[in-house]
């Protein structure tokens, strides 16, 4: 799971008459999506129907893949930051970017372009980076290159994805990656790709960046439902551990090589695993099945109006087959706030801007 420290104290800077804040730019998947896929007309990975959003605002679906808030929402709120707006939100413009930052996260997206292809439309990380480059062009036109460079270099960046590259790619025989690689070579492939992506983000100004690790993927309700005995699938969870270990090493290496880079890895595996293993310790009654399900039909994959809801959503760790409930997200957010020393605006680093490189091409339907 993926999320922490996308949050900073506000420092107001006078930029050509604008009050430019230090903001967040979030890159991720459905755990961080706040409405991008809602605006992708052909996407099969959406949270557009009830009962998604039932405990958020007016109770209507808003694009978040949960009943309430994401972890990013909760941490940002507690630190006092505005929520970054979804890139595809109709309200998006230059002023919104300068005031709130942007969330590019997309349900079904992965580090690899090929991940989640059967969802038809989703933003891979490469695509999200391309969109970010477009955001930069818009801001440069608004406030000028010098001030735009400072704005983007002062911003905070979060990269929180990777589980789809396993669950909706490598672990599915319909994808060629499942038979082209073994466990270690696939993780190596992911690390090579992610390293290239982080280097691109650095060249685009990302100096303060956090990558979040994966949780025990084999213990989400979907993976349990697909197992023979209803227990966690160790293969998937062990892949998450491999990913986390490799990402930690890669980030430490990158930080020493890239000028003025402050890169951190947010490890959450042990925390989430403990919540799932010992739910009552954290106030939950159920950690192995979704609150929103289609009667006894499992896996239901998504929550729909015909689904049935559990009696008390606050007692369930999982909202649907993939995603945590608002209550679980709140627990994780609170523990992460205590665990990590968040990157703040007042520890800024001065640096010279780097030229933007060519972006690796993304597939047409990303």
Curated annotation (Swiss-Prot):
Q: What high-level taxonomic lineage is stated for the organism?
A: Eukaryota, Viridiplantae, Streptophyta, Embryophyta, Tracheophyta
One Pfam family it belongs to: Lipase_GDSL
Q: What is this protein called?
A: GDSL esterase/lipase At1g74460
User: Which keywords annotate this record?
Assistant: Glycoprotein, Hydrolase, Lipid degradation, Lipid metabolism, Secreted, Signal
> Some GO term, biological process aspect, for this entry: which one?
lipid catabolic process
One GO cellular component, as annotated: extracellular region
Organism (species): Arabidopsis thaliana
In which broad location class does this protein mainly occur, judging by the first location in its UniProt entry? secreted
Q: Which InterPro entries match?
A: GDSL, GDSL_Est/Lipase, SGNH_hydro_sf, SGNH_plant_lipase-like
The family line of this record is:
Belongs to the 'GDSL' lipolytic enzyme family.
Signal peptide coordinates: 1-20
- Localization in the cell: Secreted
Q: Where is the active site?
A: 30 (nucleophile), 320, 323
What are its E.C. numbers?
3.1.1.-
Q: Would you list which residues are glycosylated?
A: 113, 260
């Amino acid at each position: 799971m993926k999320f922490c420290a996308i949050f900073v104290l506000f420092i107001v800077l006078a930029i050509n008459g604008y009050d430019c804040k230090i903001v967040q730019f979030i890159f991720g998947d459905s755990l961080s999506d706040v409405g991008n896929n809602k605006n992708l007309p052909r996407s099969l990975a959406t949270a557009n129907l009830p009962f998604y959003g039932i405990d958020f605002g007016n109770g209507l679906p808003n694009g978040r893949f949960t009943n309430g808030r994401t972890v990013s929402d909760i941490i940002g709120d507690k630190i006092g930051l505005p929520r970054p707006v979804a890139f595809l939100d109709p309200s998006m413009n230059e002023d919104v970017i300068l005031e709130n930052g942007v969330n590019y996260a997309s349900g079904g997206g992965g580090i690899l372009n090929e991940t989640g292809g059967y969802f038809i439309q989703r933003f891979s990380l490469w695509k999200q980076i391309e969109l970010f480059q477009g955001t930069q062009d818009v801001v440069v036109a608004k406030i000028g290159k010098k001030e735009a460079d400072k704005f983007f270099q002062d911003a905070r960046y979060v990269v929180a994805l990777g589980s789809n590259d396993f669950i909706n790619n490598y672990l599915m025989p319909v994808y060629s990656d499942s038979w082209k690689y073994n466990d270690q070579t696939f993780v190596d492939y992911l690390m090579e790709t992610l390293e290239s992506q982080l280097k691109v983000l650095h060249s685009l100004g990302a100096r303060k960046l956090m990558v979040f690790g994966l949780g025990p993927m084999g213990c989400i309700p979907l993976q349990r439902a697909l197992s023979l005995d209803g227990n966690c699938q160790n293969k998937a969870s062990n892949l998450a551990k491999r990913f986390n270990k490799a990402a930690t090493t890669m980030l430490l290496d990158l930080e020493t090589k890239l000028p003025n880079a402050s890169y951190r890895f947010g490890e959450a595996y042990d925390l989430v695993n403990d919540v799932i293993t010992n739910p009552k310790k954290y106030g939950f009654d159920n950690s192995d099945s979704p609150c929103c399900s289609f009667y006894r039909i499992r896996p239901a994959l998504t929550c729909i109006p015909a689904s049935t809801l559990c009696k008390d959503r606050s007692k369930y760790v999982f909202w649907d087959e993939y995603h945590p409930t608002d209550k679980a997200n709140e627990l994780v957010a609170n523990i992460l706030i205590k665990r990590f020393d968040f990157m703040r605006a007042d520890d800024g680093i001065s640096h010279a801007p780097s030229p933007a490189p060519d972006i690796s091409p993304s597939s047409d339907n990303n």
